């Protein structure tokens, strides 16, 4: 009987140790990510002030994003975030936008911002290709965070 119980525990452990963080990721159907194609990082994202020039999401688009996700706009709780950030060559298209929480734990907009900054530094220093950074953050930003930042 004890062996059977130990076997059950051994088989069950992977299921309990796997972190389910899907609720912290955007819905891929609504927000697959939308990178700008053919950017030369040295002439765009690595130039100081690039994101200020590139940022152009209208209030009506922001409202549509919140409607799409059936979320009430609350500026103190959510931002309309670029899945592929502007600093990684993401577009302002609605396919690249989602409401990301500031307050959820452990994964939130502040953690994603930390990842975006790290990936931009890596792209601009030649440690990673822009396309790879775009793909990794669009595919699963939390996995990319764990890979490049840890924690």
PLM features: what roles do these ranges have?
Residues 14-77, 88-151:
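Nuclease and nuclease-like effector domains acting on nucleic acids or nucleotide cofactors
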Residues 2-13:
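Sec-dependent N-terminal signal peptides
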Residues 85:
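Short active-site segment of divalent metal-dependent hydrolases/proteases
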């Amino acid at each position: 009987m004890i062996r059977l119980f130990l076997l059950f525990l051994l088989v069950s452990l992977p299921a309990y140790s796997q972190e389910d963080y899907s609720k912290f990721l955007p819905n891929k159907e609504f927000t697959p990510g939308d990178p700008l194609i053919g950017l030369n990082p040295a002439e765009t994202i690595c130039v100081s002030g690039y994101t200020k020039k590139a940022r152009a999401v209208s209030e009506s688009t922001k409202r549509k994003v919140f409607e799409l996700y059936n979320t009430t706009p609350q500026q103190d709780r959510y931002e309309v975030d670029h899945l592929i950030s502007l600093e990684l060559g993401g577009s302002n298209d609605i396919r690249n936008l989602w409401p990301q929480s500031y307050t959820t734990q452990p994964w939130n907009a502040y953690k994603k911002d930390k990842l975006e900054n790290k990936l931009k530094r890596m792209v601009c220093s030649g440690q990673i290709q822009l396309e790879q950074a775009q793909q990794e953050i669009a595919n699963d930003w939390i996995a990319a965070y764990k890979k490049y930042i840890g924690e």
